[in-house]
Each structure stands twice: as C-alpha cells, then as structure tokens.
Amino acid sequence: LIAQDNQATILKKELEAKTIAKDPKDTANKTWKKGGFFSLNLSQSSLSNWAAGGEDYAFSVNTAFSGFAFYKKGKHQWDNTININLGYINNTSLGARKNDDRFDIVSKYGHEINAKLNFSTLFNIRSQFFDGYNFPTATTQVLNSSFMAPGYILLGSGLDYKPVKNLSIFFSPLTARWVIVNNDSLSKVGAYGVTPGSKSLFQLGAFASINYKANINKNVSYIGKLDLYSDYLMNPQNVAINMNNLFAVKISNVLSVTYSLDLIYDDNIRLFGPTKDAPRMQTKSIIGAGLLVKL
C-alpha cells in the first residue's frame, strides 16, 4: 500500500508539471480574422493565313486581389478590406491597352450597440494606379485619368446594421467626400467636377454602403458591394453610384471561372455623349477562367 501511495504521488506531480499545448487551429481566443483571394486569368490567340479572318495576335491578362482583416474584442470591431484589379490587353489592330485598373481600401471602426447594430466610423480611398486614355481613333489617345485623378476620399460616421451573417448595411447622414484630381492637365480643364485649376472638390452629403457575400453552393460564391452618395451642396438628387459584383465558380482547388460586373454613375464624370461632356452609366464586365487561390 505504501508503494502504491508513493507511485500515485509521483504520477500526480508529473501531471501537475506538464503544460497542455494549445492547438494552433484553436481560434476561440483570437481577436483577428484575416483572409482573401488572388485570381489570375490569361488568354492568347494567334492566326496565320486564316481564311475566316480575325486578329493575327491577341493576348490578355487580368488579375484581382481581395483581402480582409477583421478585429473584434468585446464591443469593439475594426473591419479592413482592400481590393485591387489590374488588366492588360494587346492585339494586332489596337496595340497594348489596359482594360482594368482600380484599388479600393475601406477601414471601418465600430462600437457595438447591440448584437446587430454598431455605431461606426468609415474611411475609404479609391482610385487607380496607371494613366487611362480615350481612343478617338486607333492611333490617337487622349489622357482622361491617372493615379489619384480622379481619387475619392470619404470619411463619415453612422450606423452599421448587420441583420444576418455576411451582410452589412452602413448609413451615414453626414459624410465628407473629397474628389482629388492630382494631374495638371486634367485639373486645368476642370475634370471630374473640380474648379478649373483646382486639384480637389469638397462634398458633404449622405452615404450608404451595402456589402454582401455568400456561398451559393459549395462551388459557387458571390461578393457584392453597393455605394451610394448624395452631395447636399450640389444636385443632391443626382446620386453617385459605385457597384461591384464578383461571381466565382470553382472547378478545382486552384482553378475557377470568374465573372465581374462593375457599374458607376457620377454626375461629375462628364466624358460621354456626342460632345463628350455628359455623364452616363458606366459598365465593365470581365469573364475569365484561370487561377484562384484563397489566402
């Protein structure tokens, strides 16, 4: 019996000395959640002595990156997202041009009011990386945009409603918005609504942003965003619209088919119509097959 007692005491001390290692996959106490995806779509064709006709050579590449970092601790929430799209096309008749170019960064801090409602402050910056051109003819190009020309900076506070998982509806009745035209030739002609010679336009108005993502089934997913802005200072009835949609159909672990549809309307973007001085609804759609990697 004495021997058994001694053995039990030894085992007890050994157990007390051991520490239980935490499973690295255990995220119960993590305050940060991070992720995203990267996609790459390529296409190429070439013809030689082809009786049916067509471009002798055509090549295109489109890339997209979407990342997020969400923080939550107690009643505090901090949501950060970044979206980058770049596209390039080259063919025999038109030469090299870009067909996609944008970055969009959003940072939103919220304080929880209840399980579905936060009081939040949102910051957003949106623009492009490279020069953009109109092509009146196949050999003539006219600069119409550049890095931060236009650029949009937005700051506002309001309510962030999250009725269900993966749906966020943010509304701010008073939001400051700056339109930046950081290019001398574009600011000189008053592009994008700025006073000729000025490089910025200040706006004050109401802002709403709806963000939604869903797995339609195990192979089909959707990410959507709709931003609406009404400027109290000038023509509040002409609401600026910026909408992004992305559908992805999974083929394998790394291959997929993607379809994106973007819609933009801004009364200050007056580059269209017969005399190139009127606003229009802008649309961009891209479909492709290629690499899709979740991060």
PLM region descriptions:
Residues W50-E55, N90-G95, A138-S145, Y192-S198, ...:
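Extracellular loop and loop/strand-boundary signature of outer-membrane beta-barrel proteins
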Residues K72-G74, G110-K116, V164-N166, A176, ...:
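Outer-membrane beta-barrel channels and translocator barrels
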Residues R97-G205, Q282:
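Outer-membrane pore/translocation modules
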